[in-house]
Amino acid sequence: MSEYSLFTSESVSEGHPDKIADQISDAVLDAIIAEDKFARVACETLVKTGVAIIAGEVTTTAWVDLEQIVRDVITDIGYTSSDVGFDGATCGVMNIIGKQSPDINQGVDRAKPEDQGAGDQGLMFGYASNETDVLMPAPITFSHQLVQRQAEARKSGLLPWLRPDAKSQVTCRYEGGKVVGIDAVVLSTQHNPDVSYADLREGVMELIVKHVLPAELLSKDTQFHINPTGQFIIGGPVGDCGLTGRKIIVDSYGGMARHGGGAFSGKDPSKVDRSAAYAGRYVAKNIVAAGLAERCEIQVSYAIGVAQPTSISLNTFGTGKISDDKIVKLVREIFDLRPYAITTMLDLLHPMYQETAAYGHFGRTPAQKTVGDDTFTTFTWEKTDRANDLRIAAGL
């Protein structure tokens, strides 16, 4: 980054229409993968006033109650009444999921699992930075924390007039590549019609904004825009149509790093749009955690049906302790970025995905989870367990 600059990122809450769609798509994936680890799933969702539509391609031996899954996700988010604009119990659910094309399947499946080809061509990026403790850019980290706190305050009854839909935006000021302040904060939250703007602003400022953002980064010059239109009663799928995969920058690095264009939600790990992006984050985070660089962006690319990446490249933006070419060599030695190897390395064949579909796929904390008889670790791509290997190999 320049010596003196501003950078802005945004996030949206779990009740935002596009995020409802993402969560439904990943809930469908989780339900199928819980019964059939090797299923092929590509699930897209559309939500609009009174209806949810799921579509896509699935190859599986599992049977799951797709309609109930859709309703449960909508209800759990908090859309339980026409008063809030959407009701999981009464909305229409349309299922138009079909089977995966055999043309794609023949390019992916192999006699030897490790030779599994990529499910599609494409390019994916991973990124990490030492500007926060989770090795993520500060603007997107703060933006996620704001809408996550909005959901907590709503669900706990702390601010009972809140409704599910919300958006946040944070502008950070950088000097010498380091965050030195927050210039602007935007938080728009859906609410019931009974709360006054004065009460809403005070509640949001005191119990959400100030609760989340570091006081040392706020100043008398920080701009706060709380529901800047003055009213946000109509929200959710009534206000806007929601679609899977429309918040790919929110899902990743808030615009701080490049994006290959492929969405994550609703896709099983054979789709490198998802699994290779997770692997890219894993590699970049371990490079930064190892102290090889302060910032790192890695790109990988694939051809459909081909196991080995067609390219691996990275940029440490002048912060590397060794050359970028040497780091690429270490990446090739230490990380196997073939699709099946990624799935094995990150232990991705578990129902872990719905949790990723709100508040970002990166910068999260790995945790042990049990679903039925299956116990596994979530957010495995956030581990830094290869940092020491990189450090030793680099001679640091």
From Swiss-Prot:
- Mind listing the UniProt keywords for this protein, alphabetically? ATP-binding, Cytoplasm, Magnesium, Metal-binding, Nucleotide-binding, One-carbon metabolism, Potassium, Transferase
One of the GO BP terms on file:
S-adenosylmethionine biosynthetic process
PROSITE patterns in the record:
ADOMET_SYNTHASE_1, ADOMET_SYNTHASE_2
State the CDD domains in the record.
S-AdoMet_synt
Q: Which Pfam families match?
A: S-AdoMet_synt_C (PF02773), S-AdoMet_synt_M (PF02772), S-AdoMet_synt_N (PF00438)
InterPro entries for this protein? ADOMET_SYNTHASE_CS, S-AdoMet_synt_C, S-AdoMet_synt_central, S-AdoMet_synt_N, S-AdoMet_synthetase, S-AdoMet_synthetase_sfam
**UniProt keyword Secreted, yes or no:** no
The principal location of this protein is: cytoplasm
Q: Flexible loop: where is this region?
A: 100-110
Q: Which reaction does it catalyse?
A: L-methionine + ATP + H2O = S-adenosyl-L-methionine + phosphate + diphosphate
The entry's Mg(2+)-binding residues are 18
Coiled coil, from the record: none
Subcellular location, record wording: Cytoplasm
Matching entries from Gene3D superfamilies are given as: 3.30.300.10
What are its cofactors?
Mg(2+); K(+)
Q: Record-annotated residues binding K(+)?
A: 44
What GO cellular component term, any one, is given? cytoplasm
EC assignment: the record states 2.5.1.6
> Record-annotated residues binding L-methionine?
57, 100, 240, 271
- HAMAP family membership: S_AdoMet_synth1
State the oligomer form and interacting partners.
Answer: Homotetramer; dimer of dimers.
Q: Which family does it belong to?
A: Belongs to the AdoMet synthase family.
What does this gene product do?
Catalyzes the formation of S-adenosylmethionine (AdoMet) from methionine and ATP. The overall synthetic reaction is composed of two sequential steps, AdoMet formation and the subsequent tripolyphosphate hydrolysis which occurs prior to release of AdoMet from the enzyme.
Which NCBIfam families does the protein's record reference? metK
Q: What is this protein called?
A: S-adenosylmethionine synthase
Q: State the organism named in the record.
A: Pseudomonas fluorescens (strain SBW25)
Q: Give the taxonomic lineage as stored in the record.
A: Bacteria, Pseudomonadati, Pseudomonadota, Gammaproteobacteria, Pseudomonadales
Q: Which gene encodes it?
A: metK
